[in-house]
Amino acid sequence: MNLKLQLKILSFLQFCLWGSWLTTLGSYMFVTLKFDGASIGAVYSSLGIAAVFMPTLLGIVADKWLSAKWVYALCHVVGAITLFMAAEVTTPGAMFFVILLNSLAYMPTLGLINTISYYRLQSAGMDIVTDFPPIRIWGTIGFILAMWGVSFSGFELSHMQLYIGATPSVLLVQLTFTLPHIPVANQQKNQSWTSMLGLDAFALFKNKRMAIFFIFSMMLGAELQITNMFGNTFLHSFDKDPLFASSFIVQHASVMMSISQISETLFILTIPFFLSRYGINNVMLIS
């Protein structure tokens, strides 16, 4: 299979599985399972909890002991199993636990897929800056199409969205077997555990500009999580008003929410041009 096509499929499936449930799980829990807001917030907090430490830990494994592609495959095996389990869960406590397990498996794959893509592109003598964005954009396209598929199938308030999400995970495991061997980097022999865990990065906060950048990023992350949790739920709440109950936006809230990802897709395409022409500082200022 053509290298770029293979990486595009990998990126497409990686985010397709997330798009099938990330923005609609809140509505399913609130409307169908009757969870309260605090319980929904707790479930979504599991993504952040997992993202704090799990990518680093599995990154160490991929650097020292096991090829990144096999770590990636194992993560998706766990991810598929936990999504199948989540589809059968009906209580807040159990949902938190299962989604936490899923997040512990999924969050590291966001970094691992970049590692795999970068290695393959560099091995083929390609430029990551110019060749990777057109590949990565297929991830966002996958996210959008998954949102639309779940919405037009009438599964925004159904557990079926979780079954749909598990399917790309299974396909990704199979696709991993077709990838060439990716050697263990083994670059961390003489590094301290502080460095391996990335804790020395906190020294960057001494730089005022970096501190402002990190704080700004955290605020954007918090805003995004609120939208993921309750944006779809908010739009569905209008079905109680007869004036809006049958409107397209209420019936297909995910399609409306996908405007965010469509915007992302368009801007990803412009990154190589703007970075080369204006530099990272001006690009950040514009954004």
Identify the role of each PLM range.
Residues A42-I60, V255-T270:
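Central cavity-lining transmembrane alpha-helices of secondary-active solute carriers
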Residues F53-S67, G154, L266-I280:
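Helix-to-loop junctions at the C-terminal end of transmembrane segments
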Residues M1-A51, R209-A245, H252-S254:
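Helix-loop boundary and gating motifs at the non-cytosolic
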Residues F12, T82, P92-G111, I116, ...:
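Hydrophobic core of transmembrane alpha-helices in multi-pass small-molecule transporters
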Residues M1, L179-I215, K240-A245:
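Juxtamembrane intracellular "pre-TM" segments in multi-pass secondary transporters
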Residues W70-F84, N282-S287:
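Structural signature of the two symmetry-related core transmembrane helices
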Residues L100-W138:
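Cytoplasmic helix-loop-helix junction between adjacent transmembrane helices
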Residues Q161-T178:
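Symmetry-related core transmembrane helices of the 12-TM Major Facilitator Superfamily/SLC fold
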